[in-house]
From Swiss-Prot:
This is Methionyl-tRNA formyltransferase. Keywords: Protein biosynthesis, Transferase. It holds the Pfam family Formyl_trans_N. Belongs to the Fmt family. Attaches a formyl group to the free amino group of methionyl-tRNA(fMet). The formyl group appears to play a dual role in the initiator identity of N-formylmethionyl-tRNA by promoting its recognition by IF2 and preventing the misappropriation of this tRNA by the elongation apparatus. Residues 276-302 are annotated as: Disordered. Residues 276-288 have a biased composition (Basic and acidic residues). Its EC number is 2.1.2.9. It catalyses: L-methionyl-tRNA(fMet) + (6R)-10-formyltetrahydrofolate = N-formyl-L-methionyl-tRNA(fMet) + (6S)-5,6,7,8-tetrahydrofolate + H(+). It comes from the Bacteria. SUPFAM superfamilies: FMT C-terminal domain-like, Formyltransferase.
Length: 302
């Protein structure tokens, strides 16, 4: 099938690779290179980098609302467009241009967690399951009818990165199935009940309040790892907490217990991966060798 692929971050790359292996990708659309790193040099998106490695033509318009951009898109003569974490709103002329329309790969069980950060929000909310939906796109934000859906359990110690990687591979597999069965799939309108929105993650959500229950803090750490990274102050230094598990232990909220376990409002969490500023992530034993925490140390955010 002649396809246009539209995506930008790491999450989109396995999908691009799967489509390239099994279909004809006539063009790749992604976000333009942007300044990044200490030197603030323009850095291409992961999708642009991989597409160029595969020898695929790449476009990165800043808007698809101009008549010129829409004419260039339509001239590709694609049977369908596959969209995953692209980053631009698709106006109606773009949605209408491919013969079979535009198919979106969304990392949630729609209509729950429409929007920008469905993987983060599922973990933060304590959802026990999530999944991938293949959706026929329309003008609304993730409102289109669902063609195919697959569920997966969220593990008790899974981070955003863990779930991101699993769902990315699941999306690549599922879109191949959807394209192969497109003539037989029946679009299912999303129900009005159960709609929630996955707002973008704000940095203000990352500071840990140790008076909260351990279960909430556990979800906060896992649901913000690796970015932006839940953080606390230890010995006056900001430390990112990247992996954890619920643990036994009692103490005043924020009290550091043996083995980098920290007491919460109720219960405790054992930190299994932490990162000081300017350092690489470390497991507890190595972390404490270079950053000993005397008895009576407290974690806090202000």
């Amino acid at each position: 099938m002649r396809l246009i692929f539209m995506g930008s971050p790491d999450f989109s790359v396995p999908v691009l690779e799967a489509l390239h292996a099994h279909h004809e990708v006539v063009c790749v659309y992604c976000q333009p290179p942007r300044p990044a790193g200490r030197g603030k040099k323009d850095r291409p998106t992961p999708v642009q980098t991989r597409a160029e490695e595969l020898g695929l033509p790449v476009r990165y318009p800043t808007s698809l609302r101009t008549p010129e951009a829409q004419a260039e898109f339509a001239a590709l003569g694609a049977e369908a467009a596959v969209v995953v974490a692209y980053g631009l709103i698709l106006p109606q002329p773009i949605l209408d241009a491919p013969e079979r329309g535009c198919l979106n790969i969304h990392a949630s069980l729609l209509p729950r967690w429409r929007g920008a950060a469905p993987i983060h929000r599922a973990i933060l909310a304590g959802d026990e399951e999530t999944g991938i939906c293949i959706m026929q796109m329309e003008a609304g934000l993730d409102t289109g009818p669902v063609l195919m859906c697959e569920k997966t359990h969220i593990g008790p110690e899974e981070t955003v990165q863990d779930l991101h990687d699993r769902l990315s591979d699941m999306g690549a597999r599922l879109i191949l199935g959807a394209l192969g069965a497109l003539d037989d799939l029946v679009p299912r309108p999303q129900p009005d009940a159960g709609v929630t929105y996955a707002e973008k993650i704000a940095k203000a959500e990352a500071g840990i309040d140790w008076t909260r229950p351990a279960a909430e803090i556990d979800r906060q750490i896992r649901g913000l790892s690796p970015f932006p990274g839940a953080w606390t102050l230890l010995n006056g230094e900001r430390v990112k907490l990247l992996r954890c598990r619920l643990a036994e232990g009692q103490g005043a909220p924020g009290a550091v217990l043996p083995g980098l376990t920290i007491a919460c409002g109720t219960g405790a969490v054992e930190i299994t991966l932490a990162q000081r500023e300017g350092k690489r992530p470390m497991e507890p034993e190595e972390f404490l060798r270079g950053f000993p925490l005397p008895e009576g140390s407290r974690a806090h955010t202000a």
